[in-house]
């Protein structure tokens, strides 16, 4: 392998002399074309408490390049006396609707203050577009509908940031996290909180939304999701999350995000000091690399079939899964993945919205051996620096269920870097796929500008180191309150 190539980039948003700053990028391709929607926060200063509103630029693919339109302020994506933060869009292929989720935070209340006091100031909101981002409807406050009374036990919460996903069953998923209040003193003063990733979901094309169970064990925060076909190991919803533990955390769901199995640390994905948001995107492995094993099934008597609308997910059976204690659990393509035969099974907890509901999850055959290469691969973007947010890197996993499978990074930008979002935007001329990355960058700080670049799967394979090399995680775990 020669000297790694650095993709050319386009600066889409740049800090202004007045102090106006653009942060927290989110990228969504909308077919046909696709049209690219680049969302960011517009802030009065780089500080979280000075977030102001959400803005958008639309891009169209033309002749192998992207032509970008002017900046558009999303005036309806707001609640009175609140600041709009954390853009997280998801596209419903069935209706063509884009749902832009965000949180609306009262006044200038910082997240750290909410965590310290145990008093949530955030609302769950979304706006919708049916014309690929040209126009947007009014804001919906979904807090009561999606979270309900459980929000009383949350010090704060947020969505994404980044992008949501849709499964072939039709389920829409929006990644999220909360700081759950684990203990209070008798006079109402907060005693202890813990961060947990989870997902909001809709099974009716976005008409109604519900809250899935929390990742139950390790501290996990800002996260993204991908559907993963693990070959012999089955199909899962994969969650990759920021953590104060010195490395990223991953968790799997067998029921489309209704609940998550216990998480594990990913030593091959080190965090920067205090952590940083990162992005993942799943995609079908190149055809010669797709293993097949007919000894696995999706439901009784049904062989594992190639993906229909995306890798790793299949149409759900009609009947509900049965709890061995006599109840039923929500259906979905992930909830019935079982090996044929009577292999050993280990039951695991399925926390509800508050993490302590007496419910369950279908267990995986444990331990399982992830194949050397799986039918779904993952890309991951995150700053490479350990002490500071420096050098945007791209890593590849050809076996996502194995936390040791990540490559060393291909650095696509040298310099201060921060939050990012990845997307698969179409086929490459030489075969394979083209990906896009929207990321924070700058000459002096990571919030000087928001840059956009594209690269192909072939370029990833040519530029990432050939084999993963787990880093030394000598850093002590950090506290559970992080700067964004």
Swiss-Prot record:
Recorded GO CC terms: cytoplasm; endoplasmic reticulum membrane; lysosomal lumen; lysosome; membrane; mitochondrial inner membrane; mitochondrial outer membrane; neuron projection
BNR repeat residue numbers: 127-138, 200-211, 251-262
Region (Disordered): 284-357
Nucleotide-binding found in the keyword field: no
Positions occupied by motif FRIP motif: 22-25
Highest taxon of the lineage: Eukaryota
Organism per entry: Homo sapiens
EC number: 3.2.1.18
Name used for this protein in its record: Sialidase-4
Residues bound to substrate: 23, 43, 177, 179, 222, 242, 389
Active-site residues (renumbered): 47 (proton acceptor), 48 (proton acceptor), 419 (nucleophile), 440
Biased composition (Low complexity): 336-345
Catalytic reactions on record: Hydrolysis of alpha-(2->3)-, alpha-(2->6)-, alpha-(2->8)- glycosidic linkages of terminal sialic acid residues in oligosaccharides, glycoproteins, glycolipids, colominic acid and synthetic substrates; a ganglioside GM3 + H2O = a beta-D-galactosyl-(1->4)-beta-D-glucosyl-(1<->1)-ceramide + N-acetylneuraminate; a ganglioside GM3 (d18:1(4E)) + H2O = a beta-D-Gal-(1->4)-beta-D-Glc-(1<->1)-Cer(d18:1(4E)) + N-acetylneuraminate; a ganglioside GM2 + H2O = a ganglioside GA2 + N-acetylneuraminate
Keyword Protein transport assigned: no
Induction annotation: Down-regulated during monocyte to macrophage differentiation.
UniProt keyword annotations, A-Z: Carbohydrate metabolism, Cell membrane, Cell projection, Endoplasmic reticulum, Glycosidase, Hydrolase, Lipid degradation, Lipid metabolism, Lysosome, Membrane, Microsome, Mitochondrion, Mitochondrion inner membrane, Mitochondrion outer membrane, Repeat
Activity sensitivity to pH: Optimum pH is 3.2.
Molecular function (Gene Ontology), one example: exo-alpha-sialidase activity
GO aspect biological process, one term: negative regulation of neuron projection development
Entry's family note: Belongs to the glycosyl hydrolase 33 family.
